[in-house]
């Protein structure tokens, strides 16, 4: 097989709809736009959310809440995800990113207690739930706050 012999899978490519090219094509005359009216015109149509003059849904529903600019975004990790580390490893935020457990850290990392921990680890992150700290220590490890 060579590069010039590559072809797309059968049925994966569809020819574009050629409208307004004569009645024999099946899409001549009005080109699929119906008869007259706003939608038949050049640039015609209504904006998203417009309901024909009726009070639209997004204006009928009340506003609610606000965005707290001081809110902290904590990245959560359950203890069962830590089993991919070797016994005796020091688990830091950088180690979690390196292993692909978390993508990025905004305002810190919190370890939660869902699942079981089978490895003895020294974990160094910002926060722990009570059950997570207990499980880390029960496995023979340490839960250190940084």
From Swiss-Prot:
- Region annotation (Disordered) maps to 1-54
Q: Which gene encodes it?
A: rplO
Keyword Cell membrane in the entry? The reply is no
Native species = Clostridium acetobutylicum (strain ATCC 824 / DSM 792 / JCM 1419 / IAM 19013 / LMG 5710 / NBRC 13948 / NRRL B-527 / VKM B-1787 / 2291 / W)
Q: Which Gene3D superfamilies match?
A: 3.100.10.10
Record-annotated disulphide pairs: none
Q: What family is reported?
A: Belongs to the universal ribosomal protein uL15 family.
What the entry lists under SUPFAM superfamilies is as follows: Ribosomal proteins L15p and L18e
Q: Kindly state the subunit structure of this protein.
A: Part of the 50S ribosomal subunit.
Q: Name one GO cellular component term.
A: cytosolic large ribosomal subunit
- What's the protein here called? Large ribosomal subunit protein uL15
Q: Which HAMAP family match?
A: Ribosomal_uL15
């Amino acid at each position: 097989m060579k590069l010039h012999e590559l072809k797309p899978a059968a049925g994966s490519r569809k020819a574009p709809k050629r409208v307004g090219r004569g009645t024999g094509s099946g899409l001549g005359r009005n080109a699929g736009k119906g008869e007259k009216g706003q939608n038949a015109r050049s640039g015609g149509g209504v904006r998203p959310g417009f309901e024909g003059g009726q009070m639209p849904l997004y204006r009928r529903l009340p506003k609610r809440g606000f965005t707290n600019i001081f809110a902290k975004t904590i990245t959560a990790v359950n203890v069962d995800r830590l089993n991919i580390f070797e016994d005796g490893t020091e688990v830091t935020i950088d180690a979690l990113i390196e292993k692909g457990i978390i993508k990025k850290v905004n305002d810190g990392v919190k370890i939660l207690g869902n699942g079981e921990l089978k490895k003895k680890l020294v974990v160094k992150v910002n926060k722990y739930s009570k059950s997570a700290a207990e499980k880390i220590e029960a496995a023979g490890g340490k839960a250190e706050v940084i």
